[in-house]
Amino acid sequence: KDTDRSLFPDYYLQNFHHQTDGYLSDHSAGLYDLQVEILFNGTADAMRRRVLAPLKRGLKHFSDRSPSSLRVLDIATGTGRTLHQIRGALPHAELIGADLSEAYLRQANRWLNNGQSPLVQLIRANGETLPFADGGLQGATCVFLLHELPAEARQNVINEAWRVLEPGGVFVLADSVQLADSPQFHVAMDNFRRVFHEPYYRDYIADDIDARLIQAGFEAVTAETHFMTRVWSARKPAQPST
């Protein structure tokens, strides 16, 4: 059936990665993981795994709780590759994946909910307006999304992550390296933007993600570079003890 394009923000309806159907088709969803692995010379899953250690460290804030009571959201989960890795690291947590694309969620469902492991909840949602109550999640991740967004949407996603996290909750981002931390890759970044048709990448690589996290209200912001990926970890301030 045809996709109702009125459901999507304007930036989402552009061509991405030279695909005229962007993120809206099962064909695109079926190709995505192969494309990314080719692009990163087989290291994409290894770079996604870099979110696991800071996520687990951050969740130690809730170590007095049952592991099954922890709720972790993967924003823009796509085909579910990151969620699959999180499930391996946090086998008892309640995991949720949110994405705008029904086609990508179908692909994620085939990949994740195959009857061999606990089910992962997958919902269609915009990362700028997440359908969750304030403070109901203990962890959130967002992998390879920010470079696909215009600047205002980037901030909105980070603000929403702050809103849905419980005080003390952890937010882990992973995305492309940037000019400030990896100037030696300037030419590669420029070629990536042009060759792979990334309309917002030029703005992203000059953006200050640390400042955006702090603007949203996060603290304890840290960042590390691993090959072509930058990983940020931040905490929503815990409520003072009474």
Predicted segment positions?
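A short acidic, Gly/Pro-enriched loop at the edge of an enzyme's catalytic core
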Residues: 128-140
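Core SAM-dependent methyltransferase catalytic element
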Residues: 216-242
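C-terminal alpha-helical "lid/dimerization" subdomain adjacent to the S-adenosyl-L-methionine
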Residues: 155, 172-216, 220-226
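A short SAM/SAH-binding and catalytic strip from SAM-dependent methyltransferases
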Residues: 138-152
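Conserved Class I S-adenosyl-L-methionine-dependent methyltransferase catalytic core
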Residues: 1-57
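Conserved beta-strand elements of the Class I
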Residues: 71-73, 138
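A short glycine-rich, Lys/Arg-flanked "PGG" loop and its adjoining helix->strand segment in the class I
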Residues: 155-167
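Class I SAM-dependent methyltransferase SAM/SAH-binding core
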Residues: 73-74, 79-129
